[in-house]
């Protein structure tokens, strides 16, 4: 697994929920609801791992994987 970093910042100006940068930086808007956060995190990580995939594949599999994990009960928990 190649190195990647996750940064949380508001992405309103970019009109995005998440962004992937070629240097391995994944940015996620911290205001996302839990299920949307899961989908966006997976979506951006898929861009990292499968750079050759078309956006339609990333969208499809990001949604499928996040739906599967949600059904299993995976949730984001803030421990702050």
Residue map of PLM features:
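Metalloprotease/metallohydrolase-associated module, dominated by Zn2+-dependent proteases
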Residues: 1-36, 50-80
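Active-site recognition of the HExxH zinc-binding catalytic motif
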Residues: 39-48
